[in-house]
């Protein structure tokens, strides 16, 4: 069947029944979000020195966060201290969120009737899709990696380039994107208004006789604000200090000190919500992506991308805006080297748009064991 085949009313009942069956299975996955994610494991590859370093830090990290060893950032960059997230109510708590959950898993939002929000943001994959870049309408492949939707309730800006300023705005963009769901707002609203089930549910929630696009995005955003999962890191912050292995504890210490991770990844969501160039523009080459420059047209924005949250990072690979990094160890190696530092090729020496890697990325000189410890800690997040 072609992905562009028009929606047919004939098999709608059969398709909706199948969808409900899938929804029941997905509901089990969503319920799992209420429990902590599985532990990351034991001290794999933890050498005697690293384990000893971690054991020696037990007392230093036994007290409240404000009593932990001082944070070190590049150029004394301001940061927010680590903290627990404000947990949102479950989707079952509000009718709007329940309606948004139904829409999220329903391919009725797409032109082909075959692509749902969950196609690229699956609960079993930490609300990502686990591939380099997502595949959308008519098997088209996008340029960017699908970010997780977990813990987005308080996020101020969305998309790798900051194109969306709210969850509602973010929810609308994939629907109308010709590469993703390829549906027009007019066609979608007509479909929902003529669907007896959705027409009734929207009327019950909004009190209006007709569905508007703002109602659709409000429902999706309401559901997405409920998406969260507790992790091993949360349990540690809550006071279970024995939850971390010695290697993970040493990794936490490195994250806050020698590795300078808190320069950009701090606060309860472990991000500064800013835009930085870490050297992955691929200027003039395959995978070229100008990042935020496409929105601002400011030369300094070439190659800048939003700092992603590191929460749930163990389960959200492959990594970076283009999904070209399959492992956390590769990411740590990149930052250990001070980021990528591409040089202009002949003819590009005076190009005003040639991107410059951020000065916030010094070489770190982490040993192999230290990098292993840092990865072990990242896997607790």
Language model segments and positions:
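Residue-level detector of intrinsically disordered/flexible regions characterized by low predicted structural confidence
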Residues: 7-9, 18, 33
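Periplasmic c-type cytochrome electron-transfer domains
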Residues: 2-5, 30-381
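N-terminal secretory signal peptides that target proteins for export/translocation
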Residues: 1-13
């Amino acid at each position: 069947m072609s992905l562009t085949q028009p929606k047919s009313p004939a098999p709608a009942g059969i398709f909706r029944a199948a969808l409900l069956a899938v929804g029941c299975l997905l509901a089990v996955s969503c319920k799992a979000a209420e429990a902590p994610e599985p532990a990351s494991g034991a001290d794999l590859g933890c050498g005697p020195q690293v384990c000893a370093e971690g054991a020696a830090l037990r007392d230093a990290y036994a007290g409240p966060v404000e009593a932990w060893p001082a944070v070190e950032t590049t150029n004394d960059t301001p940061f927010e201290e680590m903290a627990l997230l404000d947990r949102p109510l479950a989707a079952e708590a509000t009718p709007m969120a329940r309606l948004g959950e139904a829409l999220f898993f329903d391919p009725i939002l797409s032109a082909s009737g075959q692509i749902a929000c969950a196609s690229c943001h699956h609960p079993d994959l930490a609300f990502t899709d686990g591939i380099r870049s997502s595949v959308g309408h008519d098997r088209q492949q996008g340029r960017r990696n699908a970010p997780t939707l977990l813990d987005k309730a308080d996020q101020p800006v969305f998309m790798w380039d900051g194109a969306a300023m709210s969850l509602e705005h973010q929810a609308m963009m994939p629907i109308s994107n010709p590469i993703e769901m390829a549906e027009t707002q007019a066609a979608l609203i007509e479909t929902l208004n003529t669907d007896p089930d959705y027409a009734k549910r929207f009327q019950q929630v909004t009190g209006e006789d007709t569905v508007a696009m703002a109602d659709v995005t409000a429902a999706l955003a309401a559901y997405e604000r409920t998406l969260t999962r507790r992790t091993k890191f949360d349990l540690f912050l809550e006071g279970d200090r024995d939850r971390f292995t010695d290697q993970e504890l040493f990794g936490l210490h490195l994250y806050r000190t020698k590795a300078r991770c808190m320069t950009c990844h701090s606060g309860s969501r472990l991000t500064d919500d800013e835009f930085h160039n870490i050297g992955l523009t691929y200027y003039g080459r395959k995978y070229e992506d100008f990042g935020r420059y496409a929105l601002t047209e400011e030369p300094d924005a070439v190659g800048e991308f939003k700092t992603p949250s590191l929460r749930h990072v163990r389960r959200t690979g492959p990594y970076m805006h283009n999904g070209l990094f399959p492992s956390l160890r590769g990411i740590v190696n990149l930052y250990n080297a001070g980021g990528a530092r591409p040089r202009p090729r002949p003819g590009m020496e005076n190009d005003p748009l040639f991107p410059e890697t951020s000065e916030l990325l010094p070489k770190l000189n982490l040993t192999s064991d230290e990098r292993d410890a840092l990865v072990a800690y990242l896997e607790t997040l």
